[in-house]
Regions:
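Short, ordered coil/turn segments that flank beta-strands lining enzyme active or ligand-binding pockets
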Residues: 39, 82, 113
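Short, low-complexity, Pro/Ser/Thr/Gly-rich segments in the mature regions of secreted, periplasmic
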Residues: 109-119
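N-terminal helix-cap/turn-to-beta initiation motif at the start of protein domains
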Residues: 4-21, 34-38, 118-120
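Contiguous, well-ordered beta-strand patches that form the walls/edges
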Residues: 25-32, 46-107
Length: 120
């Protein structure tokens, strides 16, 4: 199922649902992104950053998401905030059912095994 032609949004959304985590590093800034995508189209992200070893206040974002298939496992992820304002549109690709790459910055997200979300 993973590598056939253009998938339907529902199939991609089913693969996206769950908790994902990515680590980032750019110069003196180290970050950790945790994203939870729910079946009802809602999402929540938490960004933690450390600048030169000093932790910055975490930033949490909530809203709704929509998926537009591009080709096979490649899709565009649209997010809006709780007030309906567009936030971002990023192109992502599923490498497999547990690995997703955000094409901006080539950030690799890995599915978190735990069924417990850190935001509950």
């Amino acid at each position: 199922m993973l590598f056939r032609g253009k998938q339907k949004p529902a199939s991609l959304a089913h693969t996206l649902v769950g908790e994902w985590q990515a680590d980032t590093l750019s110069g003196d800034v180290r970050g950790e992104i945790t994203a939870v995508f729910n079946t009802d189209g809602s999402y929540q992200t938490k960004n933690r950053m450390e600048i030169r070893g000093v932790a910055a206040a975490p930033v949490t974002q909530t809203g709704r998401y929509r998926i537009e298939p591009i080709y096979k496992q490649r899709f565009k992820l649209f997010t809006i905030d709780d007030n309906g304002q567009p936030l971002s549109a990023t192109v992502r690709t599923f490498v497999d059912s547990n690995t997703m790459i955000n094409e901006v910055g080539r950030i690799t997200f890995r599915r978190v095994d735990s069924g417990d979300h850190p935001f509950n």
